[in-house]
Amino acid sequence: MDAFKGGMSLERLPEGLRPPPPPPHDMGPSFHLARAADPREPLENSASESSDADLPDKERGGEAKGPEDGGAGSAGCGGGAEDPAKKKKQRRQRTHFTSQQLQELEATFQRNRYPDMSMREEIAVWTNLTEPRVRVWFKNRRAKWRKRERNQQLDLCKGGYVPQFSGLVQPYEDVYAAGYSYNNWAAKSLAPAPLSTKSFTFFNSMSPLSSQSMFSAPSSISSMTMPSSMGPGAVPGMPNSGLNNINNLTGSSLNSAMSPGACPYGTPASPYSVYRDTCNSSLASLRLKSKQHSSFGYGGLQGPASGLNACQYNS
């Protein structure tokens, strides 16, 4: 009765509020499977169709791409096979020359370093070579020759400059004898730059007092003095009448009196010929100052009646 009452109460409910009837037990799984299968069938079919439709395309694409890939691979292999052949063709083989060929080529190179086409062809005939080989050999040989010339010039510039400079300085020390005491200070003042004008400032800036103190030194005049026992006749090449005229000596006559014929200790010619005018002017100023300063020991130059030679002045 309760169930009947419950069923009647459910029937009295409106349709919107009624619960769905329970499905039967035997139809439940099949119903669920049918409902689950109904919407899935078109999806599976579509998926299968799409997969079936796509697979041939992919296979076809794979099959189509396979030959292309294979063709590309084969082309790559063919290119790889062709590249060494091209490299071998482009790369020239090293030519091995015989001694006879080298002798002929060297002899021709000594005569002419730039042979023309006809001469290269003749050389190729003589040496049993091709003209391009002969041309390349001459090109390489010229490059080697120029490199050797440059290296030789660099060696000469590096190692030959000091000997050349010393060669300019060294002869001035070897020309003079060791007995000349004035060579010491002269060589020291002239050795750095014998031909430059900077060395002349030593004489140009020399005052009369400094020149007097220099020439009054025993080392500079003692070598030029002569013994008092040697008379006028003992001087070779100087007559007695010439000795009487030495009273009127000037700077120029003093220079002529100191020639090798009049004085056994003649002044060397080459290096000091440049300084003679400067020395003469300094000697003239020395004579003028010696008259005022008699304490410097130049008594022989004070009086005009002095009959001594230029080499006989005593300090």
From Swiss-Prot:
Q: What ranges does the record list as Pro residues composition bias?
A: 17-26
The protein's matches in Pfam families, at most eight in alphabetical order, are given as: Homeodomain, OAR
Residue interval(s) of motif OAR: 281-294
According to the record, the residues making up region (Disordered) are 1-104
Q: Per its UniProt record, what InterPro entries does this chain match?
A: HD, Homeobox_CS, Homeobox_Pitx/unc30, Homeodomain-like_sf, OAR_dom
Q: Which gene encodes it?
A: Pitx1
Ordered alphabetically, the record's keywords are: Acetylation, Activator, Developmental protein, DNA-binding, Homeobox, Nucleus, Phosphoprotein, Transcription, Transcription regulation
What protein name does the entry list?
Pituitary homeobox 1
| Span of the annotated motif Nuclear localization signal | 287-291
Q: Which GO terms describe its molecular function?
A: DNA-binding transcription activator activity, RNA polymerase II-specific; RNA polymerase II cis-regulatory region sequence-specific DNA binding; RNA polymerase II-specific DNA-binding transcription factor binding
Record's compositionally biased regions (Gly residues) = 69-81
Highest taxon of the lineage: Eukaryota
Q: Where is this region: Interaction with PIT-1?
A: 151-280
UniProt-listed GO biological process terms: branchiomeric skeletal muscle development; cartilage development; embryonic hindlimb morphogenesis; hindlimb morphogenesis; myoblast fate commitment; negative regulation of DNA-templated transcription; pituitary gland development; positive regulation of transcription by RNA polymerase II
